UniProtKB/Swiss-Prot annotation:
GO terms for biological process: negative regulation of myeloid cell differentiation; nuclear-transcribed mRNA catabolic process, 3'-5' exonucleolytic nonsense-mediated decay; rescue of stalled ribosome; transcription elongation by RNA polymerase II; Wnt signaling pathway. The lineage of its organism: Eukaryota, Metazoa, Chordata, Craniata, Vertebrata. This is Superkiller complex protein 8. Transmembrane segments: none annotated. It comes from Mus musculus. The modification N-acetylthreonine is found at residue 2.
Amino acid sequence: MTNQYSILFKQEQAHDDAIWSVAWETNKKENIETVVTGSLDDLVKVWKWRDERLELQWSLEGHQLGVVSVDISHTLPIAASSSLDAHIRLWDLENGKQMKSIDAGPVDAWTLAFSPDSQYLATGTHMGKVNIFGVESGKKEYSLDTRGKFILSIAYSPDGKYLASGAIDGIINIFDIATGKLLHTLEGHAMPIRSLTFSPDSQLLVTASDDGYIKIYDVQHANLAGTLSGHASWVLNVAFCPDDTHFVSSSSDKSVKVWDVGTRTCIHTFFDHQDQVWGVKYNGNGSKIVSVGDDQEIHVYDCPI
């Protein structure tokens, strides 16, 4: 048990180019901590976190261009990646083999996310649609249309009820998954929404934008519950802590910040990266944060819990 924030581990030269995406999944049953990274070097790498360090398990080849997004299933040993090559690939984390390659269409595979039950994969498109693919079928099952601009970011609510998307023009849309209806359109930012994340109880939505602000919304009523400033440049990624009371953000200002949801304040800032920090995630119990960036490094931080 630590009672302070500190950097625990640095993996230098983790990739041969900028690292744009990271995911961390904790398998509580088998006590396995898996980190997946995606880089502009076209590779997806699978790491195991054990004994306070990252060990490279698989280096997954297949994408022809840079990897822009990765996610790990919450229920199956599967990772997904999307790339500038317009393909989504599904990977078996037990043997490091590619399971499926899905042709999503040009610029139609940006951020991707597994549904909470891992039956579907959602990805934003440049035409303002969210395409939903079946994990089993590898085919497009349906689309949700924002009638808006290029969707840079998407997130499922943990309770499986909502899907939120963030567009290049700063518009946020929240869909009801059961009906496919657009519930709310939020005009919260004037610049691209790089990332959004739901709280573990699915009540709040946190958004990150190039305008340098982080916003917190009450999902049910679509009310703005807070505007947070502190980053000196674009906010590139946000991720909620499993404890429901903190979230983490990363920015072009090279920093990683931890925020208290209740007080809407920044409680710690890490300045360990040498360049833009594209991705941040918590582990399963909120005791660790992982970050990745243009400096080709993976950092793991200790958090008090």
